[in-house]
Amino acid sequence: MSSHARPRSLRALGVLAALSLTVVGLTGCVSRGSDTTSTEAPELVSNDQLATVTLDVGDQKGGTEALLRASGELDSAPYDVAFSTFTSGPPQVEAATAGQIDFAVTGNTPPVFGVAANARIKVVSAYTNDASGDQILVPPDSTLGSFADLRGKKIAVGKGSSAHGHVLLQLQKAGLTTDDVQLVFLQPADALTAFTSGEVDAWAIWDPFTAIAQVQNGSKTLTTAERVANGYGFGVASQQALDDPAKNTALQDFVVRLAKASAWADAHPAEWAAAYSTAVGIDPAAGELAQGRSQRPAIALDDSVIESEQALFDVFVESGSIPGGNTFEDFVDTRYNDAIAAATASTN
């Protein structure tokens, strides 16, 4: 069954960033339950019982949808998929908690904030790259030469995003604290305006925004998250969807298709970069730059991944950004690990 989601075309970085406005209604007051422990997965149902199922999937910058379409992995899905576009991961977690989406791929930090807030979500899949696309940018004429030079300066960053985690880790590495810089919490649309107008000194951001700013505006890299952050991304599912037999079955199939699509992109980098650039309406040079360093193949959601995320959670707690008390492991569900492993093995 083909997805009924419509492709989206974006014309500029500002328009791309402004997509956060489409989900403002999802990020307000959300009722959270106390269900923070893994529950037994319901029995899988047959494919013919998926004919009336629609998976609501949160997307960022068209990445998930574009990847699945370019690879052809959506073509034979026995259920429908409706994509909603978000600019960053935190509102995706909010929407999943509210039951307004069933699944989304986020960076490494939004699930950390979800754990702190007792969000009704589970982390069900993991992805990785070297984090080189997560960068702290400065204007072309900036005289700043290192992260330490940001002492007393203003840094635009999305609260609860992977960029937020990157900044805290850079502060820790430099022996600084959040008191030594001015964090200006802005989503990409407003951060772009603040950055280009000189209202902030630096912008902590991720691809493709990083690549677009570099290609179109000549922005300079002050530092990257490579060898600083863990570079993980995560598939986050709503507890409601996981508890529903039909949606649980569709979700297992979906994460398998996504893993196969990621493997396809790795094997066809030029084709994928061109398809991605067209799908989200960005400069092909920026698309090639972003996808050359920010692809995320699926990996096992194992103890090492969970421990790394717990360490990131602890950094946020120590900074006073989130309350402690919860553990990341309690918000992880590995029910799809075997299916994803089998899928990725078959593509190698």
Question: Where are each of the predicted segments found?
Answer:
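Bacterial N-terminal signal peptides that target proteins for export
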Residues: 2-16
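Pocket-lining segment of extracytoplasmic ligand-binding domains
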Residues: 109, 184, 189-278
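Short, glycine-/small- and polar/acidic-enriched structural segments
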Residues: 35-177, 184-185, 229
